[in-house]
Amino acid sequence: MKLRANRVGEQMKKELGDIISRKIKDPRIGFVTVTDVQVSGDLQIAKVYISVLGDEEQKENTLKGLAKAKGFIRSEIGQRIRLRKTPEITFEFDESIGYGHRIDTLLHEINKDGKREE
């Protein structure tokens, strides 16, 4: 069953990216990238991880806009993917990109300090 949940998650990720970028006209929603979709084993719940280009205020506004459009997004997913029941969608920020950027910055600082000591 886990394999099917992964396949549904990947398909939802592709469709959500298209729906958010082309179908939703809410001005609160900025530049959003769907980074991952985790679907439960029974295909009832889908956690959608997103990254947003912008500051904290823009991220919060985007999350509010997506929450407002959740019903529309779910109905679009239901039309595009044939499932008995369309999963309930929740949106969360993907902090891994920020962590990766922070680690990259720290590694560059360490590298600079190492060259100065030589």
UniProtKB/Swiss-Prot annotation:
InterPro entries xrefs: KH_dom-like_a/b (IPR015946), RbfA (IPR000238), RbfA_dom_sf (IPR023799), Ribosome-bd_factorA_CS (IPR020053)
Superkingdom per UniProt: Bacteria
SUPFAM superfamilies documented for this protein: Ribosome-binding factor A, RbfA
Cell compartments where the protein resides: Cytoplasm
Alphabetical GO biological process terms: maturation of SSU-rRNA; ribosome biogenesis
Gene Ontology CC, one term: cytosol
Assembly notes: Monomer. Binds 30S ribosomal subunits, but not 50S ribosomal subunits or 70S ribosomes.
Function: One of several proteins that assist in the late maturation steps of the functional core of the 30S ribosomal subunit. Associates with free 30S ribosomal subunits (but not with 30S subunits that are part of 70S ribosomes or polysomes). Required for efficient processing of 16S rRNA. May interact with the 5'-terminal helix region of 16S rRNA.
Similarity remark: Belongs to the RbfA family.
Protein name as catalogued: Ribosome-binding factor A
